[in-house]
């Protein structure tokens, strides 16, 4: 880490740091002085919110950060899911970004991958509302990822 990172949390807010879940009892500022893997509570997707292919991919990617003990299993599932999505999506921007996201996770940058996946949600909504991806394909993706929910 080239510089310190400062994060402000509100009373009752949670943060996931290196696999541990912390809840603060009052407004607090945290300053990270070295490299740390963290995820803010408002960026954590709950299983019942993983309702689209990209949200399911996000859920798996967040498990890489939240559950260090299961990192290898989560990473393997992530790679399998990306491969499946590359075969299902036909939108050039999503395909290019999925390849970049895969590279981010492979290089240990899962946090950056989460931000990139969130950036694709709007495009995915348009694709799904225009039925550019068949319901059968969406259902196939859901079945593949179901064990994670």
UniProtKB/Swiss-Prot annotation:
A GO BP entry: mRNA catabolic process
InterPro entries: Flagellum_FlbT
GO molecular function: mRNA 5'-UTR binding
Source taxon at top rank: Bacteria
Keyword vocabulary terms for this entry: Bacterial flagellum biogenesis, Repressor, RNA-binding
Coiled coil stretches, renumbered: none
Pfam families: FlbT
Reported function: Has a post-transcriptional repressor function in flagellum biogenesis. Associates with the 5'-UTR of fljK mRNA and promotes its degradation.
HAMAP family listed in its UniProt record: FlbT
Recorded family membership: Belongs to the FlbT family.
Name of protein: Probable flagellum biosynthesis repressor protein FlbT
Species annotation: Agrobacterium fabrum (strain C58 / ATCC 33970)
């Amino acid at each position: 880490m080239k510089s310190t990172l400062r994060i402000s949390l509100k009373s009752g807010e949670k943060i996931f740091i290196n696999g541990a879940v912390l809840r603060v009892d009052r407004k607090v500022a945290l300053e990270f002085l070295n490299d740390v893997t963290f995820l803010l509570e408002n960026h954590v997707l709950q299983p019942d919110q993983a309702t689209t292919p990209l949200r399911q991919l996000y859920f798996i990617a967040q498990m890489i950060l939240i559950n260090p003990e299961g990192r290898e299993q989560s990473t393997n599932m992530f790679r399998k899911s990306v491969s499946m999505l590359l075969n299902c999506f036909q939108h050039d921007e999503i395909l290019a970004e999925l390849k970049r996201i895969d590279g981010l996770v492979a290089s240990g940058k899962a946090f950056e991958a989460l931000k990139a996946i969130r950036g694709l949600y709007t495009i995915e909504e348009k694709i799904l509302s225009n039925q550019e991806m068949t319901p059968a394909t969406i259902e196939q993706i859901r079945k593949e990822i179901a064990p994670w929910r």
